[in-house]
Amino acid sequence: LRRQRQMCIRDSLKVQRRGIYGTMERDVAMMQRMLRFVPPALKGLVDLERVISEFWSAAKEEMDFLREAANMETFSKNNENVVFVASPKLYSELTTAQVLVMEYIDGYSVSDTHTLEQEGYDLVEIGEKLADNYVRQIMQDGFFHADPHPGNLRIRGGKIVWLDMGMMGRLTPRDKSLIAK
């Protein structure tokens, strides 16, 4: 990869483990077969078939790196004018359904409050900007990061950097209107 790009700084590769799709498919099929053995009382509490189906849908989306690359492009475009938000640069010409190539992001985890304070960051300001951006993603863009845990958020150069766009949520205008009420 480095020979293909002269301007290489530091890149990050996300590589799909060989055979993972088939393994997951078999695991989901086994979970569906095991539903026969769940006591009727438990079946009434939770729609386990639906839970397994939702899990499989989400897993398939996360295993498609071309979809994640498209999510990265959409997220980047939606936030291009938000001065305190960034995301990794995508190298789409090198990305495939099984390999995602992007800029490596260092920086501080949002949960590393001690270091952030030592480096002069205002934790309240970070929290306010994070909340502001997340509400904007939901209410304005209708396209939001669906896995916003500390491992997917970094602080670098005064910006909040969002990582891992494998799971993104989408809202229709009607959905946004209902939430606003």
Where are the regions that the model predicts?
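ATP-dependent phospho-/nucleotidyl transfer catalytic cores
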Residues: Y21-R26, R36-F144, R156-G157, V161-L163, ...
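Amphipathic alpha-helical "output/dimerization" segments
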Residues: M30-M34
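Glycine-rich ATP phosphate-binding loop
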Residues: R10-Q16
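Hydrophobic residue at the +6 position relative to the catalytic HRD Asp in the kinase catalytic loop
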Residues: G151-I155
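Conserved catalytic-loop position in the HRD/HxD motif
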Residues: D147-H149
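Single conserved hydrophobic/aromatic residue that forms the stacking wall/gate
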Residues: L1-I9
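Extracellular glycan/ECM-engagement signal in secreted proteins
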Residues: T172
